[in-house]
Amino acid sequence: MYRFSNTVIGVLNLLTLLASIPIIGTALYKARSSTTCENFLQTPLLVIGFIILIVSLAGFIGACFNVAWALWVYLVVMIFLIATLMGLTLFGLVVTSQGGGVEVPGRIYKEYRLGDYHPWLRERVRDPEYWNSIRSCILSSKTCTKIESWTTLDYFQRDMTSVQSGCCKPPTACTYEAGVVDGGGDCFRWNNGVEMLCYECDACKAGVLEEIRLDWRKLSVVNILVLVLLIAVYAAGCCAFHNTRHAAHPYHPSDDNRMTRVRPRWDYYWWRWWHEKKEQLY
């Protein structure tokens, strides 16, 4: 049992150690490829990836080399990691439960409304300093350049990303006739300038939040899978820690201060039975 549980914890920690590498790689990739340069998802992902890497390494060393203190540190950190990841996952599910696009009659793409999203997300994109950094990133990614050459027919037949729908065109309800603007606040914010467009529109902020919402939903699924794995590893770690201490102190005093003998392992009886049978045959 001692060797079995320590082997299991060693293998599981090796798997989580290897799994932390793509987690870190995914966070770095999304930080570079994200249209909005949104980093409040990538930062927790990076931190979690590095913590899993370090904790798994400590658990692997403790289980394979019978280092009791390494396993003790591993178990303490692991329980905090599980609690943190569980809290982050629940928070993500709550703040992404609201939102989604609105169908536009006669169009394939959807449009997005800022009021449909969770208040925590809305307050975040309304912060001027924070929004300016996202706006600069959208400009540098040339997201709107990709639809500059679209014809009127393209707007009826082709789909858009949430950022393109909110930031690169005025809302479909807007009308601009004879110098009169009608259709709501975003219609007045629209500007034909390449660096202006609808970047200050609420629809643009909503489009960014929709991209974040979808990314966070995917991250929550990954977090749940990682949580299941970490809980399994933690349970095996508790067994390995118990066995490591038992290996260091194989005999324990009883209440009357007498030493009790440890019973032979179950596989010893099978080995003796097989050895006797083999001697009878030969």
UniProtKB/Swiss-Prot annotation:
Residues 1-7, 66-74, 242-282 are cytoplasmic. GO terms for biological process: auxin-activated signaling pathway; organ growth. It holds the Pfam family Tetraspanin. This is Tetraspanin-6. InterPro entries: TET_plant (IPR044991), Tetraspanin/Peripherin (IPR018499). It comes from Arabidopsis thaliana (Mouse-ear cress). Residues 29-44, 96-220 are extracellular. It is a multi-pass membrane protein. It comes from the Eukaryota. GO terms for cellular component: membrane. It is found in: Membrane. Belongs to the tetraspanin (TM4SF) family. Keywords: Membrane, Transmembrane, Transmembrane helix. The chain crosses the membrane at residues 8-28, 45-65, 75-95, 221-241. May be involved in the regulation of cell differentiation.
